[in-house]
A protein has these predicted regions:
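Alpha-helical transmembrane segments in multi-pass integral membrane proteins
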Residues: 1-17, 23-42, 56-74, 96-102, ...
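Hydrophobic alpha-helical transmembrane segments of polytopic
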Residues: 17-24, 45, 51, 87-90, ...
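Hydrophobic alpha-helical transmembrane segments
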Residues: 47, 84, 149, 169-173, ...
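Alpha-helical transmembrane segments of multi-pass membrane proteins
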Residues: 73, 77-90
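Hydrophobic alpha-helical transmembrane segments that constitute the membrane-spanning cores
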Residues: 89-97
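Individual transmembrane alpha-helix segments
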Residues: 130-143
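Transmembrane helices and adjacent periplasmic/lumenal helix-loop junctions
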Residues: 143-147, 205
Length: 370
């Protein structure tokens, strides 16, 4: 029988996660809109990666603790129902806007296939064209989908052969170190283009695995560790936030050296940030992130992430208005499209996912990756 150190908790909505999604998609939108401040959109993607690793691993841990098994069939079916329909709607949107002439970049069958079958990241690494304009963001979804495909198998193996959570975390940490070494080798020894390490699953998967480590050994939902007093943890989270945002705005991360270690540092900084925001939802930061309008944007964030760039580029190509007006119109179009998809597609499918779930995740919590 598998070793279980902690009973599975009853989980519903984890505080602050939807708000963190909203903040992340706002960073990405601001960057792609080329608004003042020079914020780097990749910072938001890093948060998405960590959040996905944390939440998906939490769900798997709860299911395994309750049932002493993980239904891979149900896991993959839930992921398909969550990820595929909005993504294919976004691809259709890009193709329609291209056919109408509002998006002008050429589209190829290969680019559409790369988008649809989750290898857009390596398509971009190969400097191939043909992905519908604005849907280059699907590179990050490809990284996450590779994680969804492989990590459940690894997690089941760890629960069987490494029953203690500390050993599981150590094993994943060793993988993260290997990724860091590989990334550094590519950049500093082979001199590859930083684009190679930015987009590659093999060079970015550690960002997701750090979230998984957090879920396994430091999970606030389980009360795995006795956290410092709220004031101490808040100060640590505040300092980590300042350091994390320095990556978002500073050009220091544009160097090869920073590309090699920067993703690791950012992922580590997110640990105290997530720990505080999950355990202190009544703090001022927690109240902002859990404010209903902000949390609702987090619920819509997956679709908003998918379609914000096509709308931005379409508005810019067609209207010729002042930049800030175009950005505002694109933001409204993005929000309305995402809201419509949520009502017509995501909510009905969330109900279906809940019916096939062994772990009994809440509808909101199951909205895992973005």
């Amino acid at each position: 029988m598998p070793h279980r150190e902690t009973p599975a908790p009853r989980i519903g909505l984890i505080p602050s996660l939807d708000g963190l999604r909203a903040a992340s998609v706002a960073i990405v939108f601001w960057a792609h809109a080329e608004m003042p401040g020079g914020v780097r959109g990749g910072t938001g993607v890093t948060v998405f990666f960590f959040l996905s690793g944390y939440l998906i691993t939490t769900l798997m841990r709860v299911e395994y603790d309750r049932h002493e098994r993980l239904s891979l069939r149900d896991f993959y079916l839930r992921r398909v129902l969550r990820i595929f329909p909005p993504m294919y709607l976004a691809i259709c949107l890009g193709l329609i806007l291209t056919a109408l002439g509002t998006l002008t970049a050429p589209v190829s069958a290969g680019g559409v296939a790369a988008s649809a079958f989750f290898y857009a990241n390596y398509w971009k690494i190969a400097e191939l064209e043909g992905i519908p304009e604005g849907l280059g963001v699907l590179w990050s979804l490809a990284v996450e989908e590779h994680y969804y495909l492989l990590f459940p198998l690894l997690y089941v193996a760890m629960r069987r052969f490494l029953p203690r959570r500390g050993h599981q975390a150590l094993f994943l940490a060793l993988i993260c170190v290997a990724v860091l070494v590989w990334r550094s080798w590519l950049l500093l020894h082979d001199g590859v283009n930083p684009v190679r390490v930015y987009y590659g699953t093999d060079t970015r998967i550690d960002g997701i695995l750090l979230g998984a480590i957090f879920a396994i050994v430091l999970n606030p939902v389980y009360g795995d560790v006795r956290l410092p007093r709220r004031g101490v943890l808040g100060a640590l989270a505040g300092a980590s936030t300042l350091a994390f945002m320095a990556f978002a705005f500073s050009r220091i991360v544009a160097t090869d050296e920073a590309y090699s270690w920067g993703y690791t540092v950012q992922g580590l900084l997110l640990i105290p940030i997530f720990a505080y925001l999950i355990t202190a939802p009544t703090s001022w930061a927690g109240r902002v992130l859990n404010w209903k309008p902000v949390a609702f944007l987090g619920v819509l964030s997956y679709v908003m992430y998918l379609v914000h760039a096509p709308f931005l580029y379409a508005v810019q190509h067609v209207l010729g208005l002042p930049h800030v007006v175009e950005v505002a119109l694109a933001a409204v179009a993005t929000f309305l499209f995402a809201w419509g998809v949520n009502l017509a597609v995501e909510r009905p499918l969330a109900t279906l996912r809940k019916k096939i779930s062994h772990a009994g995740e809440s509808t909101t919590m199951m909205a895992a990756s973005r």
